[in-house]
Amino acid sequence: GHNPAILMKKDGSHELLETGGPVLGVFDSFEFEQGKFALGDSLLFCYTDGVVDATNNAEEPFEMERLVDFLKTQLDSAPSRICSGLRRELRNHIKDMPQLDDMTFLVLKK
């Protein structure tokens, strides 16, 4: 599934961008609403639920709070470094546990 995108602001605060509609790729076509916002010096993080649901040996999920805490430490990093850092965080969390869901994410930043 697609969780709400996270808009991380330079001051460390964040906003969840809640949207409606079906999961991408399920239907051949559908009507959707468009919106605009100024990214400014913020960071936009889009991800699938497999990121926050990724579990370790103790069956503890990675969780939204941990994801936001990680993103707060990355506000001055390039998107490629954020992605590689998050992959490392996820690997350290799940260790050798098999994952049953995709972990897909996208970082947008000026």
Which sequence ranges carry the predicted segments?
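Conserved subregion of the PPM/PP2C metallophosphatase catalytic domain
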Residues: 1-110
